[in-house]
Amino acid sequence: MTSKLINFITIEKERFEDECVKFIKNVITDSINSRNIATIGLSGGSTPKPIYEMLGNDSSIDWTKVYFFAVDERYIDKSSKDSIYDLISKSVFKNRENLLVDHFITPNTSLPLKECIETYSNDLKKLIEKSNGSPDLVTLGMGEDGHIASIFPNSPKSPLDETDLVYHTTTERFAIFDRITTNINFLASSKNKVFFMSGSSKKKVWDEMESSQINVSRWPAHKIISSGNTNVFYRE
């Protein structure tokens, strides 16, 4: 797979969070200036946590015009420390709890699974309609097995064949079996995509993915990269 489709940036540890926040903030500013709204999809993980915390401390952003949504979520109580809701509510929204309900669109995992998915899909569609049909940015990571969001490699059905905006996935590799994810085509439609990555083990997996023939079932990131406007911020 060609690397020309990726803007790969290696950043020293001391500047990593600053540069990542600067990138997100630029997308937010440009989106608000052009359409008076910014829509940002967020993934979980240990690498983006300090990025989100730093972003949440930025008082120069007009937060009333920024809407976030969960790229995926674990089907667990939202108060669990393992939920993306918990991560985002305690970082991006730590200083603006009054905006949390209306400005962070996330699955209501207290509902039965089918209803949870349907409700989240409808809420997400309404949000994206405000953003000309696609998000302004999605933040992503890639696991050492090659998964992105909760789209896991070599699933029985190719991610390219998933037509539902939001759907249920499962994994036996990680502790929480049931997941809810947005689909790969929706993520690829985002005006900007950014992967946050740290550590040599993740870089090794990334290099393997990038050097492989295009196979979205094995490497869901191939679909993201081939859609263009993909950035990778890597901390050694």
UniProtKB/Swiss-Prot annotation:
What's its EC? 3.1.1.31
Q: Name one GO molecular function term.
A: 6-phosphogluconolactonase activity
Instruction: Tell me the keywords, alphabetical order.
Output: Hydrolase
Q: Which Gene3D superfamilies match?
A: 3.40.50.1360
Look up the record and name the pathway of this protein: Carbohydrate degradation; pentose phosphate pathway; D-ribulose 5-phosphate from D-glucose 6-phosphate (oxidative stage): step 2/3
Q: Which reaction does it catalyse?
A: 6-phospho-D-glucono-1,5-lactone + H2O = 6-phospho-D-gluconate + H(+)
Biological process annotations from GO:
carbohydrate metabolic process; pentose-phosphate shunt, oxidative branch
List, alphabetically, the GO terms of the cellular component aspect: cytosol
Matching Pfam families: Glucosamine_iso
Keyword Heme in annotation: no
**PANTHER family linked to this entry:** 6-PHOSPHOGLUCONOLACTONASE
What function does the entry list?
Answer: Hydrolysis of 6-phosphogluconolactone to 6-phosphogluconate.
Give the family this protein belongs to, as stated in its UniProt record. Belongs to the glucosamine/galactosamine-6-phosphate isomerase family. 6-phosphogluconolactonase subfamily.
The name on file for this protein is: Probable 6-phosphogluconolactonase
Q: Which organism is it from?
A: Dictyostelium discoideum (Social amoeba)
